Amino acid sequence: SPNGLLQFPFPRGASWHVGGAHTNTGSGNYPMSSLDMSRGGGSNQNGNWVSASAAGGSFKRHSSCFAEIVHTGGWSTTYYHLMNIQYNTGANVSMNTAIANAPNTQAQALCNGGQSTGPHQHWSLKQNGSFYHLNGTYLSGYRITATGSSYDTNCSRFYLTKNGQNYCYGYYVNPGPN
């Protein structure tokens, strides 16, 4: 994705933990289209908002825990393990709009199945309907390098680069799209 298109999918100024890239299902190693992000807070996620990560979005509410936003240029972003989704299909949402909360319960997080080890959002990038490998993609001005296997947090294979500096998995503050 071009630099400036995407921001972290949590509110600007907030700090969330960003884990290693992985496939949408978590199995296999390609395309690593997804990131898990969490704010902490245990079983009370009511104040932890998930935000639209790109502009010009047409909202799709797939279920009570899964949403997608279709952006320009064939891009879309998906958000799983949600609760309290704020919009219905067809709504137009802009970048940084609060769309839902991270889930309070595992049952809510997994309303469409899968696995979860604690409250977090599962964010994915798609282009023309297919999951898109994040290696080389920009998110909040950070260029993602993801050359290992799913959930790999070894900083030689998964890291984010900004202004010539490499950053490993960990907490990031959302500066916006750049």
From Swiss-Prot:
This is Beta-lytic metalloendopeptidase. Disulfide bonds join C65-C111, C155-C168. GO terms for biological process: proteolysis. Binds 1 zinc ion per subunit. It catalyses: Cleavage of N-acetylmuramoyl-|-Ala, and of the insulin B chain at 23-Gly-|-Phe-24 > 18-Val-|-Cys(SO3H). It comes from the Bacteria. Zn(2+) binds at H120, H122. The keyword tRNA processing does not apply. Keywords: Disulfide bond, Hydrolase, Metal-binding, Metalloprotease, Protease, Zinc. GO terms for molecular function: metal ion binding; metalloendopeptidase activity. Its EC number is 3.4.24.32. Pfam families: Peptidase_M23. InterPro entries: Dup_hybrid_motif, Pept_M23A_Blytic, Peptidase_M23. Its cofactor is Zn(2+). Belongs to the peptidase M23A family.
